[in-house]
Regions:
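Generic alpha-helical secondary structure signal
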Residues: 17, 21-25, 108-115, 198, ...
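Non-catalytic C-terminal accessory region of glycerolipid acyltransferases
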Residues: 4, 131-240
Length: 240
């Protein structure tokens, strides 16, 4: 069965999704000329869902009713694998912008689509770059528009969670936005960092109660709280 699926993945699913990805990027680029909030989200949402379906990956969502669609949030999630992106894009159910590395914009077509969609490009190399990132975020995060961040900064190599960087929590506290921890479980088994081969399976997104901004909170405290909450819903062999 593994060999049959591998033939299906590389000879059928991957070529279809390559074409679909280019079409989605082009639709996003053109659509964002007219309405960035709509065309920067919905084409990619359905692209991500189709990507999961065609690769026989099921996404189960728990706790999404905790989210108010009129509120802007900072969503933070652990980063198990590439399918975290498809799971969040397709099944978050809330319009958002990614906080992503600026280098992604160098990818032909896809990079242009990300820029046109208004995703927040992170440049941490200079103080001015950080100020520009915060200014861009401030312009976007209102009226229910949210942001999604992987605080680890990269996919795990082992399945275990890495340390959290503070950027997302600094942003949340500075702008007074609630932070929503999301536990992603199953993505590492579907496609870990070390391979491009997909293993069909189930990914679970678990939404936790929003953590409201409090003036007494510091960045390290909120970061630690979110990491603890996210980790508690992971299997024991995925905890550090």
């Amino acid at each position: 069965m593994v060999y049959i699926y591998r033939i299906y993945q590389w000879c059928i699913a991957s070529p279809i999704m390559l074409v679909y990805s280019i079409i989605t990027a082009l639709i996003t680029i053109v659509g964002c000329l007219f309405n960035q909030d709509y065309w920067g989200y919905f084409p990619a949402k359905w692209w991500a869902r189709v990507w999961c379906w065609i690769h026989l990956v099921r996404v189960k969502v728990v706790g999404r009713e905790l989210i108010d669609h009129e509120t802007s949030y900072v969503f933070v999630a652990n980063h198990q694998g590439a399918y975290d992106i498809f799971s969040i894009y397709g099944f978050l159910g809330h319009n958002f912008k990614w906080m992503m590395r600026k280098g992604i914009t160098n990818i032909p077509i896809i990079g242009t689509a990300c820029r046109m969609a208004g995703h927040i490009l992170v440049d941490t190399h200079t103080a001015q770059g950080l100020r520009d990132t915060m200014a861009a975020a401030k312009k976007k995060l209102h009226g229910g528009m949210s942001i999604v961040v992987f605080p680890e900064g990269r996919r795990t190599d082992t399945g275990l969670m890495g340390p959290f960087k503070n950027g997302a929590f600094k942003l949340a506290l500075e702008f007074g936005l609630p932070v929503v921890p999301i536990t992603i479980d199953g993505s590492y088994k579907v496609m870990p960092r070390s391979t491009f081969n997909v293993t069909p399976g189930t990914i679970t997104l678990t939404f936790h109660e929003p953590i409201q901004h409090q003036s007494g909170n510091d960045i390290a405290q909120v970061s630690h709280q979110c990491r603890t909450i996210i980790q508690q819903d992971l299997p024991e062999d995925m905890r550090d």
